[in-house]
Amino acid sequence: MRSRQLHNVSEDRETLSRRNKRSKTSLNGHIPIDLLIEIFLKLPVKSIATCRSVSKFWTYVLGRQDFTELFLTKSSSRPQLLFACANDNGYFFFSSNQPQNLDENSSPIAAYPLTHVPKSRDLGPPINGLVSLRGERILKGRIRPVDVSIIYNPSTGESLTLPKTNMTRKKIYTVTSFLGYDPIEKQYKVLSMNMSYEKHPKCEGYQVLTLGTGKLSWRMIKCCLNYQHPLKNSEICINGVLYYLAMVNGSSWPTRAVVCFDIRSEMFNFMEVYRELSYTTTLINYNNGKLGMLMGQEAHKTISGICRSFELWVLEDTVKHEWSKHVYLLPPLWKDAVANTRLYFAGMIGTSEIVLFRPDEPLCVFYYNIDRNTIKRVGIRGLEAFKYFRIFLNHVENVKLF
């Protein structure tokens, strides 16, 4: 009995010690910060966005970098599929759990509504749960809306409107913007390129904006390529390097190539690929760290039932530009499962599951397993009202607020 009492006293002292240690991190008599963080980590991301408006103290806690990183780490352990459905009113975002280990009788995917961003276009892939897009917004000091870049959080509906880029008024431009992230410096940057169309399309100005540094402003940078025409919806950011497809000067005429932009150094580089890139070339994050390229047969702009094979190229050495090439022959079932459906590569889950989709039919996606050489059609529920969509793999929820 005496021993049990001593044991209870010891436990009480340990509990009191933890509480005293925890209370040291509180401010002005509020609930201790680390206890609040533990509670907030259990809330859904939409609830966290609502909690920002409760008090200045909660806003402070939810804006701390340690909380943001903890939440992102937790979210990364359960990646999702992100659906972006477009119509005349902008983008409508949906999400669902990312299927793992698909079996023969795979159930339909249920897409749950997230948020809506009006009057928007040119959507880029999510970077740590944030996306870049363009839209017309009324900036401070202006009466009419102007075309600007926007950083948007599909999970919370929060957005950040960026200032208008600098450009020469005498010329007609369109602007292409890509979002990137440097995991070492933990910085988000936006690369913007002004496209001129006087004789033929080309970039005439490169600008960079760093997020989270106070005042938002664009800085002019130089590019080593004397001609390039970036292809929209082709970009991907891996380990602090932004890769995208572009038309660049070849030996005799422009050719498709992979352009690299280092987020930290803000330097461009040209990636040599000893093969002409086909219309179906899609950049992917292979095995969570390597640049990969999925390509169908050169004669086709999409993947359909008549295709017999496709290629997977993996960048093995970023300095020497050495690639490994893998050719996959599609199974006989491919022709019956896909038929005349025109598909696009969405990306790759892990090292074996390739996901394909048809943009104008948000009713299903296709999973091709390169190890088992099998193809599965999986239905989608919840997107029936839309006629166009895009799908992004390995999406994570983020509570970042700049």
Curated annotation (Swiss-Prot):
InterPro entries: F-box-assoc_dom_typ3, F-box-assoc_interact_dom, F-box-like_dom_sf, F-box_dom. Disulfide bonds: none annotated. Residues 1-23 are annotated as: Disordered. Signal peptide: none annotated. SMART domains: FBOX (SM00256). Residues 26-73 form the F-box domain. PANTHER family: BNAA05G37150D PROTEIN-RELATED, F-BOX DOMAIN-CONTAINING PROTEIN. This is Putative F-box protein At3g23960.
